[in-house]
Amino acid sequence: MSTFKNEMNGNNLLHVAVLAFPFGTHAAPLLSLVKKIATEAPKVTFSFFCTTTTNDTLFSRSNEFLPNIKYYNVHDGLPKGYVSSGNPREPIFLFIKAMQENFKHVIDEAVAETGKNITCLVTDAFFWFGADLAEEMHAKWVPLWTAGPHSLLTHVYTDLIREKTGSKEVHDVKSIDVLPGFPELKASDLPEGVIKDIDVPFATMLHKMGLELPRANAVAINSFATIHPLIENELNSKFKLLLNVGPFNLTTPQRKVSDEHGCLEWLDQHENSSVVYISFGSVVTPPPHELTALAESLEECGFPFIWSFRGDPKEKLPKGFLERTKTKGKIVAWAPQVEILKHSSVGVFLTHSGWNSVLECIVGGVPMISRPFFGDQGLNTILTESVLEIGVGVDNGVLTKESIKKALELTMSSEKGGIMRQKIVKLKESAFKAVEQNGTSAMDFTTLIQIVTS
C-alpha cells in the first residue's frame, strides 16, 4: 500500500468526515476501518463524529492515536435534565430524532477549525441523510454496513416486501420469498422495521436507508464476496458499487485482550473439538427458564463447556449446578471470544447469532448453534443453518432441554456435525483467501481508499 502514501503526500486539503452511530457494535468497527484508511493516507484529515460517551470509550482505550484523526463530540439528543422512562430504546429514538441537525452543527465546527471543506462522508449506513448532506457539500458519500449482506438486502427490499404482504398482521404472514438462495421466510425471521414496528423511529431510519443507499458512491460491507454470491449479485445490481471489506476480524486492527480467567489455558487441557463455548453477546440474556434448561442440558450431555455469563451465575442457575459441573465446565464473566473460537478444542459455539459472532465462527472454523433474539439474528440463523449449512438453530428459537440436547448431539456427535465442520473450514479458507494480497476483500479495500482519499 506504500504507493498510496507516495501519491497522497500532496493531498493535505482532503477532509473526510466520519459519522458514527453510538449504539451497539457500530462505532468501534467504523473507527477501526477509518484508522486503517488513515494510516494509508497520512496527509488526509479525518474528523470522527460521535457522542461524548462513545468517543470517550473509543479513544481512551485506543493505543494508537493517529495524528490525522481527530474526534468531535455530537450531542446525544437527550433533553436537559433527562430522566429515563425505563424504555432502553428511548435514548436511541431521541438520538435519531435530533441526529441530522446535530451532526451538521459539529461538522461546521470541524470545517471552520481545519479550514478544509468536507471532500468525503464516511458514515454508518443507518445515516440515510448522508446522500443529501454529501450532495450539499459537493462531497462523496461512502456508507458502511456492519452487518451481513442478506439483512441489508431486506432493507433495500422493504417496500417490495410490504407490497407482497399487504396490510396483513405479522402473524398472518405465512411465508415471504424475497431473498435469492434463501428458503421462504416467516415474518418473524425478518429484522424489525421491515413489516413490523414500521412506525417507530428506528424502523423509519432503516426504511429511508434502504431507499437512499443506491445514491452512494460506494457501499462498504463487513463481509467477503464468496459468502453468498447470489445476494452479492443482487446488491451489486442495486448499488453503484458494493465493496466487501471484511471480515473485519481479519482486515482491521484488533485490540489486544486479556485472558484474566485463564480460558485458553483451560482449553489447552481438552481434546480437539470437544468443548462447547456459550455466549449470547453483551446485550441480551436468555430468560430464566431458558437458562435453567441450558444448564440442565449441559449437565446431562456431559460435554465440557466454557460459558461467558452475564450476571451472577449463583443466582441465575439451578442450585448446585456450579458445584456439580466444576470439573467439566468453566463459567466466566467475560471471555476472549475471538481467541477461544480459534482454539482447536472448541467444537461448537452456542450463540445469539449476531453478525460479528457469525464471522468469528467462520474465521475460527467452528460450527454454531443459534438462539436468535432480535434484529438480523433470525436471518443469520437461517443463513448458517439452511443456506451455508454450518450450524443449526434450536427448535422454535427457544432453549429447551430437548432442543439444546438435540442441537448439541447433532453438532458434536453426529455425521452431519462433521459435515458442518468440513463446510465451515472451507468457508474459513475462503475468508482468509479474500484478505490476502490480490484477494477480493483486499482489492475492494484498495478501491475504498481510492474513493475516500481522492
UniProtKB/Swiss-Prot annotation:
<feature type="binding site">
    <location>
        <position position="356"/>
    </location>
    <ligand>
        <name>UDP</name>
    </ligand>
</feature>
<feature type="binding site">
    <location>
        <position position="352"/>
    </location>
    <ligand>
        <name>UDP-alpha-D-glucose</name>
    </ligand>
</feature>
<feature type="binding site">
    <location>
        <position position="352"/>
    </location>
    <ligand>
        <name>UDP</name>
    </ligand>
</feature>
<feature type="binding site">
    <location>
        <position position="335"/>
    </location>
    <ligand>
        <name>UDP</name>
    </ligand>
</feature>
<feature type="binding site">
    <location>
        <position position="155"/>
    </location>
    <ligand>
        <name>myricetin</name>
    </ligand>
</feature>
<feature type="binding site">
    <location>
        <position position="375"/>
    </location>
    <ligand>
        <name>myricetin</name>
    </ligand>
</feature>
<dbReference type="Pfam" id="PF00201">
    <property type="entry name" value="UDPGT"/>
</dbReference>
<dbReference type="GO" id="GO:0009813">
    <property type="term" value="P:flavonoid biosynthetic process"/>
</dbReference>
<comment type="similarity">
    <text>Belongs to the UDP-glycosyltransferase family.</text>
</comment>
<comment type="pathway">
    <text>Secondary metabolite biosynthesis; flavonoid biosynthesis.</text>
</comment>
<feature type="binding site">
    <location>
        <position position="377"/>
    </location>
    <ligand>
        <name>UDP-alpha-D-glucose</name>
    </ligand>
</feature>
<dbReference type="GO" id="GO:0008194">
    <property type="term" value="F:UDP-glycosyltransferase activity"/>
</dbReference>
<feature type="binding site">
    <location>
        <position position="202"/>
    </location>
    <ligand>
        <name>myricetin</name>
    </ligand>
</feature>
<keyword id="KW-0328">Glycosyltransferase</keyword>
<feature type="binding site">
    <location>
        <position position="356"/>
    </location>
    <ligand>
        <name>UDP-alpha-D-glucose</name>
    </ligand>
</feature>
<feature type="binding site">
    <location>
        <position position="89"/>
    </location>
    <ligand>
        <name>myricetin</name>
    </ligand>
</feature>
<feature type="binding site">
    <location>
        <position position="192"/>
    </location>
    <ligand>
        <name>myricetin</name>
    </ligand>
</feature>
<dbReference type="GO" id="GO:0009698">
    <property type="term" value="P:phenylpropanoid metabolic process"/>
</dbReference>
<feature type="binding site">
    <location>
        <position position="357"/>
    </location>
    <ligand>
        <name>UDP</name>
    </ligand>
</feature>
<feature type="binding site">
    <location>
        <position position="308"/>
    </location>
    <ligand>
        <name>UDP</name>
    </ligand>
</feature>
<feature type="binding site">
    <location>
        <position position="360"/>
    </location>
    <ligand>
        <name>UDP-alpha-D-glucose</name>
    </ligand>
</feature>
<feature type="active site" description="Proton acceptor">
    <location>
        <position position="26"/>
    </location>
</feature>
<feature type="binding site">
    <location>
        <position position="355"/>
    </location>
    <ligand>
        <name>UDP-alpha-D-glucose</name>
    </ligand>
</feature>
<feature type="active site" description="Charge relay">
    <location>
        <position position="124"/>
    </location>
</feature>
<feature type="binding site">
    <location>
        <position position="376"/>
    </location>
    <ligand>
        <name>UDP-alpha-D-glucose</name>
    </ligand>
</feature>
<keyword id="KW-0808">Transferase</keyword>
<feature type="binding site">
    <location>
        <position position="334"/>
    </location>
    <ligand>
        <name>UDP</name>
    </ligand>
</feature>
<comment type="function">
    <text>Catalyzes the glycosylation of flavonoids at the 3-O-position. Glycosylates the 7-O-position if the 3-O-position is not available. Also able to perform 3-O-glycosylation of anthocyanidins.</text>
</comment>
<feature type="binding site">
    <location>
        <position position="360"/>
    </location>
    <ligand>
        <name>UDP</name>
    </ligand>
</feature>
<protein>
    <recommendedName>
        <fullName>Flavonoid 3-O-glucosyltransferase</fullName>
        <ecNumber>2.4.1.-</ecNumber>
    </recommendedName>
</protein>
<feature type="binding site">
    <location>
        <position position="335"/>
    </location>
    <ligand>
        <name>UDP-alpha-D-glucose</name>
    </ligand>
</feature>
<feature type="binding site">
    <location>
        <position position="25"/>
    </location>
    <ligand>
        <name>UDP</name>
    </ligand>
</feature>
<dbReference type="InterPro" id="IPR002213">
    <property type="entry name" value="UDP_glucos_trans"/>
</dbReference>
<keyword id="KW-0587">Phenylpropanoid metabolism</keyword>
<feature type="binding site">
    <location>
        <position position="282"/>
    </location>
    <ligand>
        <name>UDP</name>
    </ligand>
</feature>
<feature type="binding site">
    <location>
        <position position="337"/>
    </location>
    <ligand>
        <name>UDP-alpha-D-glucose</name>
    </ligand>
</feature>
<feature type="binding site">
    <location>
        <position position="357"/>
    </location>
    <ligand>
        <name>UDP-alpha-D-glucose</name>
    </ligand>
</feature>
